[in-house]
């Protein structure tokens, strides 16, 4: 019997899911980016699993506790559920440089691959930094999208200014 591996949409948190205000850990500072819910619903309809992969060095720096981060995750997941969106899992790196999970290393992405038997070549990673793109390359993710208004150079598939532009791109390609 032949089983197809599952495709995944990986999302960075700060700058993709929420507006990046540097070290966001309080609910009152968390503001969803325009278009995130529509983008996620599109990929759910295409049978992708949804994952968040986020560096959270503010924990190691002592700016906030892991419990603060987890409380914000709980709030965020509930807001996604209100929009009929299931995030399959959140992966986070609470460390500073030097660990295997911190992007641009691929530890978080490879953990998801192993836990969910993912088809990385047919998966997508959307991030707002070149370190996200490098992590995606390191994990052999097939499609890398950089969402950033500032032109960047790097080994990524496509750069878009915002999430609505990304959604239009995928709809045009019928991905």
Where are these regions (language model features)?
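Active-site neighborhood of HAD-like aspartate-dependent phosphohydrolases
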Residues: 2-49
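Gly/Ser/Thr-rich beta-alpha loop segments that engage phosphate groups in nucleotides
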Residues: 17, 60, 64, 129
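Hydrophobic "anchor" residues on beta-strands that sit immediately upstream
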Residues: 8-10, 51, 124, 128
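Alpha-helix N-cap and loop-to-helix initiation/capping positions
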Residues: 27-31, 64-71, 103-104
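A short acidic, helix-capping loop that chelates divalent metal ions and anchors anionic groups
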Residues: 21, 26, 58-63, 96-100, ...
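Asp-based, Mg2+/Mn2+-dependent phosphohydrolase catalytic module
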Residues: 2-3, 67, 74-89, 96-125, ...
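Acidic active-site catalytic centers that drive phospho-/nucleotidyl reactions
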Residues: 12-14, 55, 128, 132
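Substrate-recognition element of Asp-dependent hydrolases with the DxDx(T/V) motif
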Residues: 36, 40-73, 89-96, 136
